[in-house]
Regions:
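Fungal secretory targeting signals
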Residues: 1-19
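Short, solvent-exposed beta-strand edge segments and adjacent coil->beta transition regions
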Residues: 46-48, 124, 156, 212
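Functionally important transmembrane alpha-helices
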Residues: 216-218
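Short N-terminal segments immediately surrounding and downstream of signal-peptide cleavage
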Residues: 20-31
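Extracellular beta-strand-rich solenoid/capping regions of secreted or surface-exposed proteins
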Residues: 58-66, 72-90, 96-115, 119-133, ...
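Right-handed parallel beta-helix
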Residues: 86, 91-92, 109-120, 133-147, ...
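Acidic Gly/Asp/Thr-rich repetitive segments characteristic of extracellular carbohydrate-active
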Residues: 29-69
Length: 218
């Protein structure tokens, strides 16, 4: 694992099954960067939609139009959804789950993912952030399920940030019962691509029962 400029603020231990903090303000590199704060879909002229089915979800995250998306229920994907730029993706209540396939943020900018449970994503990451800028991952729960019986290679990372991604904040998330957690930069062969990027802030996240310490905070 190769880390670039990585800012660890505070790793607060929460007693409940999800981060118990009341802080919802954006801090760190997702806010303080040369481009401007991560706002997601909260922009002038944006639209707001509520989705409860996979087709509605996929339609809402497509494209680059500023959109605030409220997601209700469980979304079991058979292929990885790719979130477009200028999106706020917000789970409603405690029952918003992503299963089957995880989320991809690729070649995008200005994306917020908040208040989801992301569970049992086989052979890939819960969230992959690749070559993307200004992303805020906030108040989510990540778990593999069937831990540790499934072994270390059934699942990949819970939230991986790679390939020159920049100006990222990961806050108030609960990572648990999983072999691999969260990495920043995934291969030395991408050193030239990553150089000068990978500004990432982690704060107030809780890691519990994670099976591989080299992908977890030290």
């Amino acid at each position: 694992m190769k880390l670039s400029i990585l800012s660890f603020f505070t790793f607060a231990l929460a007693a409940s099954a999800a981060p118990a903090g009341t802080g919802f303000d954006l801090v760190g590199f997702g806010k303080d960067n040369p481009v401007g704060p991560t706002t997601g879909g909260d922009q002038k002229g944006s639209k707001t939609v509520t989705v409860s089915t996979v087709p509605e979800f996929l339609a809402a995250i497509n494209g680059t139009s500023p959109t605030i998306i409220y997601a209700k229920g469980t979304f079991n994907f058979t292929s990885r959804p790719r979130i477009g730029s200028n999106k706020s993706l917000i789970g409603m209540g405690s029952g918003a789950w992503i299963t089957g396939k995880g989320l991809t943020i690729l070649n995008a900018t200005n994306v917020i993912v908040r208040n989801f449970g992301i569970r049992g994503i086989v052979d890939n990451d819960g969230i992959t952030i690749q070559n993307s800028q200004r992303v805020w991952i906030d108040h989510n729960e990540f778990t593999s399920g069937n831990f540790p019986a499934a072994g270390p290679d059934a699942f990949d990372g819970q939230c991986d940030i790679v390939r020159a991604s920049d100006w990222i904040t990961v806050s108030w998330n609960y990572f648990h019962d999983h072999w691999k957690s969260s990495l920043v930069g995934n291969d030395d062969k991408f050193r030239d691509i990553d150089f000068g990027h990978l500004h990432v802030t982690y704060h107030h996240n809780y890691w519990k029962n994670e099976g591989r310490s080299f992908r977890s905070p030290k």
